[in-house]
């Protein structure tokens, strides 16, 4: 189910009607985007705390997949908000669009950082370097 992630609340250009309604839908999508990065946090925590090789490989793969999802969602939300901004909008809607673009950029960057952390952990594992000395025995 994770690999099938898609936008639930916003659609292409044909789906934009009233800017205020479009903004509400985009807000829901941004909140859902936040949940994706929260899941990535859990995956990284598992990488740090779980030494089972199979579990760790699963987490590495999930983080890589989720990083791709964050890239895609940022672009799709930004494109949607760009379409909304081309309509006649109020200053308040314009400010909300700018805010959501900033948030989606930050969430995508968080996804990148989690991915970079996972790659660092992977390199650390390959070199048999451990966070805690007792992990060296396993």
What are these regions (language model features)?
Residues 1-138:
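Cytosolic, long alpha-helical scaffolding segments
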């Amino acid at each position: 189910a994770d690999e099938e992630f898609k936008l639930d609340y916003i659609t292409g250009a044909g789906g934009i009607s009233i800017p205020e309604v479009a903004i509400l839908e985009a807000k829901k999508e941004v909140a859902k985007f936040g949940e994706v990065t929260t899941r990535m946090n859990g995956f990284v925590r598992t990488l740090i705390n779980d030494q089972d090789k199979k579990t760790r490989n699963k987490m590495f793969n999930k983080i890589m997949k989720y990083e791709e999802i964050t890239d895609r969602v940022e672009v799709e939300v930004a494109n949607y908000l760009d379409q909304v901004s081309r309509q006649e909008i109020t200053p308040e809607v314009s400010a909300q669009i700018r805010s959501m673009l900033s948030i989606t950029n930050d969430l995508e960057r968080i996804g990148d950082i989690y991915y970079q952390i996972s790659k660092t952990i992977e390199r650390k594992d390959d070199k048999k370097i451990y966070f805690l000395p007792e992990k060296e025995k396993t």
